[in-house]
């Protein structure tokens, strides 16, 4: 597979495994070239229960799209869903470095650094850290704090966590097929980002994705 041209995504569900391949144009913009869906076995409610069946299911979909496009898939992005994926919120703050001249990017990065230091429980991993809001001096909520005047910058982050076991099992299935995982994402988060506009997110719209064993709400 020509790494510079193709982007591959694998979505392993309880009833189907879907492989999508996009090709980058000269300006780096992706365009979908192929989407293949095959029945999946060995998955229950998003959790891999039989590694042999799952490997064979992924292999069937990967080989089908590979034959169609004349490529060999060796790396891919993957999605994951199940009741082992959850959200948790954490609020923290920093004091601004130069209150007279307003909040700067360094202050925001310092706040992000504090959030990066938040640790997940031993049996979970943090998949995403997403700022929900910013609060300047505890009374001024802003979407982008840079330039706002204040001594204290706070934020509440939404943490997307996933149990380690399903991640390890999915990575094992990929390794058995010689596929390197480029990144793993919560399906609900990716679906919401792809389908909802910025205004819809602000207004509280939701996307409901009903699968064979898992229903995601974003």
PLM regions: where:
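Nucleotide/phosphate-binding catalytic cleft detector across ATP-hydrolyzing
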Residues: 1-16, 20-207
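Glycine-rich phosphate-binding loop of actin/hexokinase-like ATP-binding domains
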Residues: 203-218
């Amino acid at each position: 597979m020509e790494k510079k041209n193709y982007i591959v995504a694998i979505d392993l569900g309880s009833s189907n495994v879907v492989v999508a391949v996009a090709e980058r144009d000269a300006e780096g913009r992706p365009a979908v070239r192929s989407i293949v869906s095959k029945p999946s076995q060995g998955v229950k409610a998003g959790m891999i229960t039989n590694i042999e069946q799952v490997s064979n299911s992924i292999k069937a979909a990967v080989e089908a799209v590979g034959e169609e496009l004349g490529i060999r898939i060796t790396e891919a992005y993957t999605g994951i869903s199940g009741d082992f994926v959850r959200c948790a919120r954490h609020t923290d703050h920093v004091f601004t470095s130069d209150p007279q001249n307003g909040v700067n990017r360094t202050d925001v990065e310092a706040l992000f650094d504090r959030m990066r230091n938040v640790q997940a429980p031993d049996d979970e991993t943090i998949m995403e850290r997403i700022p929900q809001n910013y609060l300047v001096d505890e009374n001024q909520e802003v979407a982008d704090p840079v330039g706002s005047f204040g001594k204290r910058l706070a934020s509440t982050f939404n943490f997307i966590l996933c149990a380690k076991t399903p991640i390890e099992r999915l990575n094992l299935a990929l390794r058995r097929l010689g596929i390197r995982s480029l990144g793993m994402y919560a399906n609900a988060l990716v679906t919401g980002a792809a389908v909802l506009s910025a205004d819809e997110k602000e207004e509280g719209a939701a996307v409901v994705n009903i699968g064979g064993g898992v229903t995601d709400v974003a």
